[in-house]
Amino acid sequence: MSVATGPWGLTSAVPASAGAADAVSALLGQVRTALTAAWGVPVGPLGLRHACPRCGSAAHGVPALTGLPPGRVALVSFTRVRMPGTEDRARIGAWWAPARPADGLGLGVDVERADAAAFADEDGLGGVGFSTAERARVRELPAPERPAARARLWTRKEALVKAAGTGFTGDPAAVDTLTVPTDVVLVDLTDRLPGGLVGTLALRGR
């Protein structure tokens, strides 16, 4: 039975122009406020560390919160996207407080612009990043709906590999978005995002 339950949420977008350190600090401040409300206990200042499962580097890889109250578990994931109507990039974070600790927990979030050129047709990312079955699923839709559908499928792929803690390790087309693993819950975030954006949250438990 999946343990992918418990409160979760999204941060507001923080402009990347704020600088990487300030943007991350602002996102962690929002996560701190959300966790305090979710747990009903004060949460102090939070920090962030990384661990790459492939090379062991602490300069990149899966993000993990530091400074959590004793006995509490929470996960975070981050994404960057160019906001609609502007050339400015922004960072968006997701947090999850699992209902019970367990091995193998993972969280992944991805947000993309529905009108991004990469998803416009099958000559771009749409032709190489998706499986035959995924491309067939998109072709079932009216032509005007296909770019957004490709973008949404891509966010599912990104969220899945982030929740697995690996990132893409091979051909993105091999990451199946039509058959979701039993230990993963996928949440379509589109209705929670500004117009023109699509997104997916992946919560992985055991």
Q: Model-predicted segments: where are they?
A:
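Core catalytic alpha/beta fold that binds nucleotide/phospho-ligands
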Residues: 1-206
